[in-house]
Amino acid sequence: MEAFLQRIASRLGRDVRTSVERPQWKHAPQQTVFQGYSQNELLDVLKQQCTRIHTTFVETNSAELRDTLQQVIAAHGGGPIVVANDERYEQFGLSSFLQREDVYVWDATRGRDNIEAAERANIGMTWSDITLAESGTVVLLNNRDQGRTISFLPTTYVALIPKSTIVPRMTQAAHIIREKHVPSCINFITGPSNSADIEMNLVVGVHGPVKATYIVITDR
């Protein structure tokens, strides 16, 4: 091995390197994308990106969230609906929504029943933990009360997005995640499922939801 490395180094006109010298980058463009943008400006970026990723974009506020949610559910054909066991439903005044007969709340103690409920569901709904404006991506920090199947087995995916969760791009999301206890599963969801062949023929809904709606709560 030493002779092999020596031969390569001699061809390159230098000594064999035995350690790594990390480069000192002069530029870090990933840090400056949308730098200085306000939350309203990032919201506009997200809204525009949704037009490119086949995702319906809806704005509302806390007071009107319940009615908006009912309208979105009706537009997608109603239940069954599967949701995470998430305290934010109560925080946003949606506790009564969870009592609907067509709503199944994920229960970590019920094992396979959760997956079967997600398979039957027309709508899967989660809250976004971090939202990337640049790509229109919802970031889910999954846990025992929020299984992965909620967001990919139902026909339609609905994300509830407090405006405060919107950041410019993946760079900021990575910083936020590093400061947390990193979960075993982090999902990045960018609209409905997409697949394309070598000729770039795009097909929506092959490996997951056929439709997606983002509901942004603008005052939270």
Swiss-Prot record:
<comment type="function">
    <text>Is involved in L-lactate degradation and allows cells to grow with lactate as the sole carbon source.</text>
</comment>
<protein>
    <recommendedName>
        <fullName>Lactate utilization protein C</fullName>
    </recommendedName>
</protein>
<dbReference type="InterPro" id="IPR037171">
    <property type="entry name" value="NagB/RpiA_transferase-like"/>
</dbReference>
<comment type="similarity">
    <text>Belongs to the LutC/YkgG family.</text>
</comment>
<dbReference type="GO" id="GO:0006089">
    <property type="term" value="P:lactate metabolic process"/>
</dbReference>
<dbReference type="InterPro" id="IPR024185">
    <property type="entry name" value="FTHF_cligase-like_sf"/>
</dbReference>
<dbReference type="InterPro" id="IPR003741">
    <property type="entry name" value="LUD_dom"/>
</dbReference>
<dbReference type="Pfam" id="PF02589">
    <property type="entry name" value="LUD_dom"/>
</dbReference>
<dbReference type="InterPro" id="IPR022823">
    <property type="entry name" value="LutC"/>
</dbReference>
